[in-house]
Design a protein with these regions (language model features):
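Metal-dependent amide/peptide-bond hydrolase catalytic core
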Residues: 27, 243-488
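Sec/Tat-exported extracytoplasmic proteins
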Residues: 43-47, 51, 55-58, 79, ...
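Histidine/acidic-residue-rich, glycine-tolerant segments that coordinate divalent metal ions
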Residues: 124-134, 140-141, 157-277, 287
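N-terminal signal peptide c-region/cleavage motif recognized by signal peptidases
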Residues: 21-23
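Acidic/His- and Gly-rich active-site-bordering loop/insert found
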Residues: 27-135, 144-165
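Glycine/charged-rich beta-loop-alpha catalytic/anionic-binding loops adjacent to active sites
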Residues: 120-136, 222-226, 376-378, 417-426
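Bacterial N-terminal signal peptides that target proteins for export
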Residues: 1-13
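Divalent metal-coordination and catalytic microenvironments
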Residues: 54, 75, 95, 106, ...
């Protein structure tokens, strides 16, 4: 009896999924695009399985060992050639299928966030397995949908005799804005003719924000320890240097632009009050709407750090962990994604799924609106820059790139939180991932079969960049900041 019940639940879930996707099949599609859509629907159970496995793993940045292995193994079993451990990162990989041009890339992310793990329930509750990290940004869905789209495109291309190369980029450590920066520096996107991406969200919309360029850097100060009371004159306080630097930066805030964002923490400040701290460290982010502005403020802060070292008779060292550009939008690709998002439609959430979302909102004392089920029109002009930064921006300055969001979490709940982790471990979240996989597969097939679209995207890219080659914000010899221990 137990076995029959289990089969029945799976059958009902798959039947519901097929009903939910029938409207998109009824539209007039080319044979190649119909093949891509059919292949994605056939892969829906596999996408769900991947998404749930990644949710269970919930491995944090550059520690995504099981997650990367799972996705790379699936692609390899499907016939993709997989290069693992690229760009000096053990959990980064590139999977390719096909030959010749065009080379169309899809980005996959799979890292989790520390401290936001939660059971897939509409209230704060720890996971039974004790894992405290969680998919508060939905990268379990991101990775599963992107790999699913790559598999669907491979099958459709083989069935239809479509030429070209499909490329799936396994990009770790998006949450620390690291993975794609080092992959870009290694030249891994250089031969791609276009790249597509998506992200879980609380709306259904094509990305139309540039985001902010950013530098993420650490400043270490080295002084001399001494007894804080018996002989402080023999000490040189590294903590004094950090505080003096921070004070200088806080005075600087009056004289930067309204678009500038500067934030810091002090991860190391000394060991005990009765010891003059011989080591201290400040960790900074500086952001603005373009790379040039970030560099200007960064240079100023470095001078403040130098002055703080001089004023406290300490030594200092700066480490630029990572840096990114603002997102370089591509209108032709945006329009193609918008058309295919409208073709596929939004996730068809059930009454029970909407009730889950509303219960979660009620728990958080947020208006009980449930999941968003509208598609936002693509505006003629870019939206104002968001506060965040993304390493996808580096790809967007190498090749035409565009992305979109699909609803995977209840509206207005805090992002990067236990609440979004809960949503991303449900079938409602998976529905969003499957919609995303379809949009990626359809747009990917557009790029393989519509030479005018690809040419238009590339021409637009050349206009936006002025024909200038991509320059990494990082020193050419810098290696990725790999973790020293394994943790979730």
């Amino acid at each position: 009896m137990k076995s029959k019940t289990h089969v029945s639940k799976r059958a009902l879930w798959f039947f519901a999924l097929m009903i939910w996707t029938l409207p998109s099949q009824a539209q007039d599609l080319s044979p190649q695009k119909q093949a891509a859509l059919d292949a994605t629907e056939a892969l829906s159970p596999e996408i769900r399985k991947m998404a749930m496995s990644l949710w269970q793993y919930s491995e944090t940045a550059l520690r995504e060992v099981e997650s990367a292995e799972l996705l790379a193994d699936i692609l390899e079993e499907e016939g993709f050639t997989v290069e693992r451990g690229v760009a000096g990162m053990p959990t980064a990989f590139v999977a390719s299928y096909g030959s010749g041009e065009p080379v169309i890339g899809i980005l996959a992310e799979y890292d989790a966030l520390p401290g936001v793990g939660n059971a897939a329930v509409p209230q704060k509750a720890p996971r039974e397995d004790g894992v405290t990290s969680g998919q508060g940004c939905g990268h379990n869905l991101f990775g599963a949908a992107s790999v699913g789209a790559a598999l669907a495109l491979k099958r459709a291309m083989a069935a239809q005799g479509t030429g070209g190369t499909i490329r799936l980029y396994g990009t770790p450590a998006e949450e620390t804005v690291v993975g794609k920066v080092y992959m870009a520096k290694a030249g891994l996107f250089d031969d791609a003719d276009a790249v597509l991406e998506w992200h879980p969200g609380q709306e259904n919309k094509v990305r139309n924000q540039r985001g902010r360029a950013m530098n993420n850097f650490e400043v270490e100060f080295f002084g001399q320890a001494a007894h804080s009371s018996a002989d402080p004159w023999n000490g040189r306080s590294a903590l004094d240097a950090v505080e003096l630097m921070n004070y200088g930066v806080n005075l600087m805030r009056e004289h930067v632009m309204p678009t500038t964002r500067i934030h810091y923490v002090i991860p190391r400040a000394g060991e005990a009050p009765n010891v003059v701290p011989e080591y201290a460290k400040a960790w900074y982010y500086v952001r603005d709407v373009d790379r040039e502005s970030v560099q200007k403020w960064y240079d100023w802060i470095l001078k403040i750090a130098e002055g703080a070292a001089m004023g406290t008779r300490t030594e200092h060292k700066v480490f630029l962990v990572t840096g990114v550009h603002e997102y370089n939008l591509n209108r032709p690709l945006q329009e193609a994604l918008q058309a295919n998002l409208e073709q596929v439609g939004v996730p068809a959430f059930t009454e029970e799924e909407q009730a889950f979302a509303k219960k979660l909102q009620a728990y958080l004392e947020i208006e009980e609106t449930g999941y968003d089920t509208e598609i936002t029109p693509l505006a003629d002009e870019p939206e104002p820059a968001s506060g965040g930064s993304t390493d996808v921006a580096e790809v967007s300055y190498i090749t035409p790139t565009a992305g979109f969001n699909v609803t995977t979490a209840a509206a207005d709940i805090p992002w990067h939180s236990w609440a979004t982790s809960a949503c991303h471990g449900t079938d409602a979240g998976v529905k969003g991932a499957i919609v995303a996989a379809k949009v990626l597969a359809l747009t990917g097939m557009d790029l393989f079969t519509d030479a005018e679209l690809l040419e238009s995207a590339q021409n637009y890219f050349e206009e936006q960049t002025g024909g200038e080659s991509y320059q990494s914000p990082l020193p050419s010899d810098q290696e990725p900041p790999l973790p020293t221990t394994s943790s979730r």
